[in-house]
Amino acid sequence: MNLYVYLQGGLGNQMFQYSAGVSALKEYPQFTNLKLDASFYEGQEVKVVKDGHTGRNYDLDVFNISYADVEEAPEGSTMLEGWFQNIKEFENVSDKIRKEFTFNVDFSEQTKKIEDEIYSKVNPIAIHVRRGDYIYNPNCFSYHGVLEKEYYDKSIKMINSHYDNPHFFVFSEDVDWCKQNIKTPNLTIVGSECNDYKDTGHLYLMTKCKSHIIANSSFSWWGAWLGNSELTIGPKKWKRDGTGSDIMLDTWIKI
């Protein structure tokens, strides 16, 4: 019997949804196959904003997850639908998920250059600054809000107290804002030159860092988790209304 997972949102959201499906497949033996329903993306274009919504596409092809598993669920099928943004949703298959989320992407020379720079540092720290659609999309802004300079200042101060000579790698689509607001020695700002296929360059590079200052974004959550982050700092207020903070692991620091 097939178990269907309804995919929605961007890459980080799809990763949570897929993980919940893998977990359910293990938990309920009556299901033998996991299928991905990507009908949410029909007629959408990547990064096109229309009527207050950001267009999305099926993104799990950046890993070794076959597109052959994408199939619209027939009427009457068992369907998992939700966001599942909590480690408890797939803790029973976490090792399997780490293996399945192996990148199947040919990264650019620029991305490989930054990767080499990360490996050359004793204490490479990833900082993710999510602005973009959180600013220009009214729905995203009212739902997520935007992390301001104060959050990053406090987080950097904490990292500096924990590590000797950390080197910060800032990943963002808003390079100008980062240049004006992220002030610390030993800083490399990584912008669109390392986006690569479906923006995976930033996620891949974040997984190579030792510790992480994440945004209120599932994208950077995965950067920290897949990177086995030594020290992760995240926002106490994940969504603008104050909900959603249970996405943070118990061992992560909230600011």
Over which residues does each language-model region extend?
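N-terminal pre-catalytic "stem/leader" segment of glycosyltransferase-like enzymes
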Residues: M1-S39
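Structural motif
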Residues: N2, P124-I125, H167, S211
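Conserved aromatic-histidine-acidic binding/catalytic patches
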Residues: V5-N13, C140-H144, Y197, S211
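Short, solvent-exposed loop/turn segments at secondary-structure junctions
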Residues: G10-G12, S39-Q44, F84-K88, R130-I135, ...
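Donor-binding and catalytic core of enzymes assembling or modifying cell-surface/extracellular glycoconjugates
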Residues: L11, M158-I233, R240-G242, I247
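Gly/Pro- and small hydrophobic-enriched strand-loop and loop-to-helix capping segments
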Residues: K26-D37, L226-I255
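Short beta-strand segments
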Residues: K35-F40, H128, H167-S172
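Secretory-pathway luminal glycosyltransferase catalytic domains
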Residues: G43-Y163
